[in-house]
């Protein structure tokens, strides 16, 4: 279809150019008299055969003026006067003198609209029929427009003349039919229809019924060339500065302002009172002035030193929105926004992914282009970029939507697919898990240097110690996958004197262990998320959120594995329900029990009979002890904040300090140090 239309346009251009250069001659009947249209065509052929006096100019223009001058045809004269004098109509009498019949103001522009459309006004048909001179030519009227508005001398005004051919409208033809059939003869309805058809055939232009697109294209091109400056927007602009519009503006200016717009009236009067600012500018004649800036050469020397801090602009890093509290998500959040638009004949899709990784309060994003309907068409993994808070994420989606609409310049459809909470692991009751490797992103910072590296996978120990109730951690039950969802944070610039190295590990997923060996009937699906953050004081803050309903929560750090058995108290584990009373902490009970747990390197678990509860753990790094009294510096401290621990912990019991010495507990200083540490790291309860 597109190719056929282009061919039709080319054909139309060829036909117009051929008719302009070599118009074909027509054959007429010798008996009949030529109509005004035939006379115009013969004049057109005659002018085309003549050579133009000036090159690149055409002679086959202004044919109606030339025809009137050759045959002295009678015309309807329309005078356009300047100012508020309006316009008038004149008819020529038998003696050759023109008499003015109608004079109207420019506000009554109905007749002018008919003249602009080159149509015969029906209201003038009766007046023109009573004229002394026959003014009709094949049903048409030749009108001469005399424009006096451009004349500067009003005493002897001159005018610009232009001729137009006014064709009868259907309303004028109906009036002619009624005037003809209003005599004494009896006209039937069939006779009236036959008369109307003959009038239409006599006044209508030649009709081409060729079913070719080139005919329509040719007609449209000719009409466009004729009506270039006569479009509706151009008419609207012309009317804005017409005399009638200017008169209306002057009348409105003299009216008093209504009471509601007194301020506008005051501002207009104040604006009129202010005179234009006078500038005393004297322009010298050419050649009398000398441009001094052209005479004096300009030498610029490069400065030896540049104050960079004076001109440099410091861009602050992205900070989370303070209006929204920092939320540590317990699960991954992923939202996909697919933008679909049709550019040309191709469907383009772009996917914007906004996601929040496990244990990271910041939002990240990535953009990828989908080549087909399936989202798997994009094989390349797009790079992710930092967005910030949730408000920033919404702003990014809105800005990207506006960007796609502005570039596509067409309607854009947006599809939102919310991934919601993505469960990290699903275990059916009684199902054993296969051991998996744990990969971590470790950032080591030395004083003055920061090195990022990825260590080899760390295997979870299959078994650590034994208990009276049996080996509760079998290789099939130990499972966990730790990974870094976000890039590690940059190393700090300053460190305490006693701190030589700090390790921070981002743990993304930690699976729950199903106690199949203990009570297979009570196991269910478990989900746990862990986040480890670096503390400036050399402590690692671990945020654990998980469902600990009668099962074991596995936590991993630089210490030996910590675990707990739900049913028995043995050297292999610690039952927190027996350690923590309802009234508060029992610091004296920690060291003796923790000694056996540290020596055996056994896991330690947490029991909770309630539903999902968050858990915060603060873990200290190794530091060199200065003396034996400072037992905390030689040990690794872990503070667990159990928020809303349900059955076995009251709201006033805020924290429990578990001290696992790297060389074992045996001195009395360990007990006192553990009591002081547990009191020092107490945190308020989170509701």
From Swiss-Prot:
Any one Gene Ontology cellular component term annotated for this protein: SAGA complex
Entry keywords, A to Z: Developmental protein, Gastrulation
Composition bias, Low complexity: 460-479, 667-680
Renumbered residue ranges of the record's region Disordered: 423-502, 666-687
Gene Ontology biological process terms in this record: gastrulation; regulation of transcription by RNA polymerase II
Known function: Required for MAP kinase p38 (MAPK11, MAPK12, MAPK13 and/or MAPK14) activation during gastrulation.
Sequence ranges of Pro residues compositional bias: 485-495
Protein name: Transcription factor SPT20 homolog
UniProt family annotation: Belongs to the SPT20 family.
Gene designation: SUPT20H
Pfam families tied to this protein: Spt20_SEP
Keyword set includes Transcription regulation: no
GO function term, MF aspect, one: transcription coregulator activity
Keyword Cell membrane recorded: no
């Amino acid at each position: 279809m597109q190719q056929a239309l282009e061919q039709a346009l080319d054909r139309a251009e060829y036909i117009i150019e051929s008719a302009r250069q070599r118009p074909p001659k027509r054959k007429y009947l010798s008996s009949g008299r030529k109509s005004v249209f035939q006379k115009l065509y013969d004049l057109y052929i005659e002018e085309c055969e003549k050579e133009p006096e000036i090159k690149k100019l055409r002679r086959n223009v202004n044919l109606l003026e030339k025809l009137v001058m050759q045959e002295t045809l009678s015309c309807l004269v329309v005078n356009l006067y300047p100012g508020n004098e309006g316009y008038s109509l004149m008819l020529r009498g038998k003696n050759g003198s023109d008499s003015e019949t109608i004079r109207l103001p420019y506000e009554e522009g109905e007749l002018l609209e008919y003249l602009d459309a080159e149509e015969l006004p029906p209201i003038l048909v009766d007046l023109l029929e009573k004229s002394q001179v026959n003014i009709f030519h094949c049903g048409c009227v030749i009108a001469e427009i005399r424009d006096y508005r451009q004349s500067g001398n009003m005493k002897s005004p001159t005018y610009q003349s232009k001729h137009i051919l006014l064709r009868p409208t259907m309303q004028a033809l109906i009036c002619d039919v009624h005037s003809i059939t209003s005599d004494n003869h009896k006209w039937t309805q069939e006779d009236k229809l036959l008369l109307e058809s003959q009038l239409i055939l006599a006044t209508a232009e030649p009709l081409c019924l060729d079913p070719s697109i080139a005919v329509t294209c040719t007609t449209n091109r000719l009409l466009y060339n004729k009506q270039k400056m006569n479009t509706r927007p151009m008419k609207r602009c012309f009317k804005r500065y017409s005399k009638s519009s200017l008169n209306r503006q002057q009348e409105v200016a003299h009216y008093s302002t209504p009471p509601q717009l007194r301020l506008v009236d005051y501002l207009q009067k104040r604006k009129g009172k202010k005179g234009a600012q006078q500038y005393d500018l004297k322009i010298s004649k050419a050649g009398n002035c000398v441009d001094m800036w052209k005479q004096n050469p300009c030498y610029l020397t490069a400065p030896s030193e540049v104050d960079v801090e004076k001109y440099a602009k410091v861009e602050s890093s992205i900070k989370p929105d303070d209006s929204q509290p920092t939320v540590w998500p317990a699960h991954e959040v992923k939202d996909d926004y697919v933008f679909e638009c049709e550019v040309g004949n191709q469907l383009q899709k772009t996917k914007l992914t906004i996601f929040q990784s496990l244990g990271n309060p910041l939002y990240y994003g990535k953009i990828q282009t989908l080549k087909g309907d399936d989202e798997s068409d994009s094989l390349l993994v797009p790079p992710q970029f930092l967005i910030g808070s949730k408000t920033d994420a919404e702003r990014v989606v809105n800005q990207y939507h506006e960007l796609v609409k502005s570039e596509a310049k067409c309607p854009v459809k947006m599809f939102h697919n919310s991934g919601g909470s993505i469960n990290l692991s699903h275990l059916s009751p009684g199902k054993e898990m296969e051991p998996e490797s744990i990969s971590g992103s470790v950032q080591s910072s030395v004083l003055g240097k920061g090195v990022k590296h990825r260590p080899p996978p760390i295997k979870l120990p299959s078994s650590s110690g034994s208990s009276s109730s049996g080996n509760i951690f079998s290789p099939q039950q130990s499972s966990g996958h730790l990974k870094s969802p976000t890039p590690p944070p940059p190393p700090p610039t300053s460190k305490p004197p006693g701190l030589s190295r700090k390790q921070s590990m981002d743990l993304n997923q930690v699976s729950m262990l199903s106690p199949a060996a203990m009570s297979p009937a009570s196991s269910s699906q478990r989900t746990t998320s862990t986040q480890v953050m670096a503390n400036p004081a050399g402590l690692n803050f671990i945020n654990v959120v998980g469902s600990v309903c009668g099962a074991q929560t596995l936590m991993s750090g630089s210490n030996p594995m910590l675990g707990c058995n739900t049913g028995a108290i043995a050297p292999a584990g610690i039952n927190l329900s027996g350690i923590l009373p309802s009234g508060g902490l029992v610091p004296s009970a920690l060291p003796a029990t923790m000694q056996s747990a540290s020596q055996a390197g056994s896991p330690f678990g947490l029991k909770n009979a309630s539903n999902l509860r968050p858990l915060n753990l603060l873990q200290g790094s190794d530091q060199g002890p200065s003396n034996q009294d400072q037992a905390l510096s030689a040990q690794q401290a872990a503070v667990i904040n159990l928020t809303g621990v349900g059955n076995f912990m009251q709201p006033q019991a805020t924290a429990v300090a578990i001290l696992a010495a790297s060389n074992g507990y045996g001195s009395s200083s360990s007990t006192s140090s553990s009591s002081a540490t547990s009191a020092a790291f107490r945190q308020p309860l989170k509701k």
